[in-house]
Amino acid sequence: QNGEPEFRKKTGRDMANRHEARKAMLGDYAYKFWSALRRATMEQRQQAGRWTALRQSERLAEIADKLTRDDDRLQLNPAIKVPRYVSGVDHHCMPGSYHTEYFPGDVTNGANYDHAGFVTTAGMLGKYTDGGGHAVVNWVKTNLPDFKPKKILEIGGTVGHSSLPIAQAYPDAEMTIVDLGAPVLRYGLARAKSLGVDNVRFVQASGEDLSMFENESFDWIQTTMFLHELSSSALRNIFNETRRLVKPGGIVLHVEQPQYTDDMSLYEQAMRDWDAFYNNEPFWSRMHELDLDTQMEQAGFDRASLIHGGVTAVVDKDLFPDAADDDSEDYGRKAAWHVIGARV
C-alpha cells in the first residue's frame, strides 16, 4: 500500500512530496514488516560476512602481504584524515565501513565487502561482483567505439569490483583506483593480482583532493555507485577535481541509481529512500534530488557536452539470472543504473 487513499481521506489533499509518502507508509503494517525483515537481512549478511572474514583475518592479511609487499602499485598514506561524513557512518551496516583497520596490514573489511557482497546482490552482479564494471565497458564500447584511453581513474573504487573489468577491457591503459580505506586497497591489489590483472594501481587518497595528480592527467574518470556516499560539499569538490583532471577529448562518467524527478511517483521515491533511513546511507535522499546536470555545469563542464544513458549489469547467464533486464520495478534493488557524465 502506498498510503495515498488514507492520506487523501485524512487531509483532503494529495501528498506533496516523498517525505509525506514515506510517513504515510509507516502506518501500514505490511510495509513495516517488510522493512524490518529487510533491515534484519542486511544485519545478518554483515554478521555472516564478518564472521567468515574475522576468523581468518590474520591469514588473509598474510596472503595479501605476500602478494603486495614492495609493490609500488599499492600507495598508502598513513597520514590521511578520513572525513567525518565517512567516519561517522557504518555504510551498509558494515561495522567500521571501508576504512577501519583492526591491526597493521589488515584487509578484513575488504574481504567482507568482497565475498559477502555477492550474497547481498543475490549473484546479479556476477561471480566476482563485477557486473557493473562490465556494463560500463559495454556502454563505452557501444557509444564511443573509437575511444582509446591510456590513463583511467576510478574514484571510490574500493576493492576494484567495477575497476578491473575496465582495466581488462583496455589492457594498454593504466588504471588507477583511489579510495580512502587502506584495508580495501590492500585487499584490492591482492585480489587484482590473484585474478591476473596487472595494469592497475591502488592509491589511498580522498577524491576531494587529488592534488598528487597534475591537471589533465586522465583520459577517463569513473565513479560507480559512489555519489550517494557523499555529502553535498564532497560531491561538489569531487566534480571540480574530475574537471581539472580530465584531458581534452576525455570522458567523465558517473553510474548511479536514477535521480528523483517529477516523472517518478512519490511512492517510488519513498521506496527508494529506504536506504537513507534504514541502511546507513544518510546522503542517499539528498543526493538523489540534486540536479546533477547543474552540478556538472557548475564544476566547469559545458552543458552541451553532457552524457546521459543507462546500463544493466553483465553477468554469466549460465550461472545467474539476468534479472536486470526484466521490466519489473524493484525500487533500486536490481542491477540497472543511470549514467551521467561529459565528453570534454
Where are these regions (language model features)?
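C-terminal alpha-helical "lid/dimerization" subdomain adjacent to the S-adenosyl-L-methionine
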Residues: L253-D318
